[in-house]
Amino acid sequence: MRTALGVRADDRKAERVYDTREMALSEEWLLHAPKARPLGKGEKWNVFLSYRSVNRIWVLTLYDVLHQQGFEVFLDQVVLAGGDELIRVLEDGLQQSQAGVLVWSARTGDSDWVRREYQTLERQALERKTFCFVPVLLDNSKLPIFAANRVFLDFSSYPDGPNGGELLRLLHSITGKPLSPEAAHFAAEQDGLAKQLADEIGSAIRNKDPELLLDLFKMGGLAWETSSALGCKAAEGLIKLGRNDDALGMLEQLSKRFPRAVRTRQLQALALARRGKNDDLRQAQRILGTLYEAGERDPETLGIYARTWMDRYSKSADRSDLEQSRDLYAEAFERATDDYYTGINAASKSVLLDTPEELARASEYASRVQQIVGTEAHPGDYWMTATVGEVFLLLKKYDEAARLYKAAVGMARAEKASHESTWQQACRLMDKLKPSEEDRAKVRAAFSHLPDCS
């Protein structure tokens, strides 16, 4: 069972300076948001999160929101320690939880997994009358037949993280409390506002308009206050558009607003690593190393941490730095075997290590990743499509690699920083794979808007 981030809420109060307007907005939200139920005998967690790694960013934002609201949240990749018996820890975590949230989308892909998770949580709800089972749907995909007897909360308007009125409904559902008429009216108002802002942020990224992202953030409002989802989406957009200084400024404010949020720290480290000035790499590794030691070992944290070790290798040429990068990607992939991002990087770094044993390992990783991502483009998903291309590159199928890389660039033309990262990786791999000049030119054509490898 792919579950929960587990970090216990503590009594430390983060310092924050509110202006009058911000305080009024927060009080309005708190007026309608229910508090976590007191933990009873044998209970350790208010809520248990069940999910697949393909939805990890959304779940991480949900974790941040719940933790910020004072809920004790079980999330496997935080709770689990090396050597733990996975099934036993998950079973204990579920038994010790007051509620369970099943996060599902079409990208989950594995109907058998959905059925098992659904039946497990449904059984808990039948056996324990106080247990609240809350299924959550992240897109407009059709629900499986076996799930038709239960109402799913619809977060299809919030692909980047929970927000708006649906978040308020989720909080009520996991505490077993119905919405009052006033809360229902408030939730409906927030749905429209949060959806509009998310669409404006997405449009600004697509239109290469970082100034609009900054203006939207500066305007603020309740939708920016209740969840870090909008702020993180805007900051990630700035990173994609190469505005790392602005992203870091935005993330500093978000960290003060959401002091327990993990996603903001991940993005801070990513922006520092991409900026690459002076002490940036050291500071990025300090953030990520601290998260790692604190038990935050989800694929996103491990993936960015591994990336910084690759950056370090690029400067040092020290093979141990490259091995550290590959090992972190491999650790993440073994923790979440459906996470294609860490899987493809474990494969690629193994190629760069360039021994017969490592090349065999790379082939095994690449085959596993191809089972996840398939062989065709994924409309609207740059990174998954680029990963399909990278698998073909590793398999030395250069025509197919070029086709998929071109498709990836075409669906995210504004994301130049993402293109640069993908092209640099392809260059490193081709240095080891030794394609013919003709085959290299095919791959190069997809990135003709970027300088060639130095």
Question: Where does each model-flagged region fall?
Answer:
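Alpha-helical linker/edge segments of TPR/alpha-solenoid repeat scaffolds
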Residues: 275-280, 312-318, 351-362, 398, ...
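TPR/TPR-like (Sel1-like) alpha-helical repeat modules
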Residues: 333, 347, 351, 366-368, ...
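Amphipathic alpha-helical repeat scaffolds of TPR domains
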Residues: 189-203, 224-236, 258-275, 296-315, ...
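C-terminal interaction surface of TIR/SEFIR-family domains
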Residues: 1-68, 132, 137-215
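Helix-turn-helix repeat elements of alpha-solenoid scaffolds
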Residues: 201-215, 236-249, 273-287, 317-326, ...
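Amphipathic helical hotspot of TIR/SEFIR-family domains
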Residues: 89-92, 96, 101-141
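Conserved BB-loop
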Residues: 61-92, 107-115, 154-158
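Alpha-helical junction/boundary sensor with strong preference for TPR arrays
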Residues: 220-224, 258, 288, 295, ...
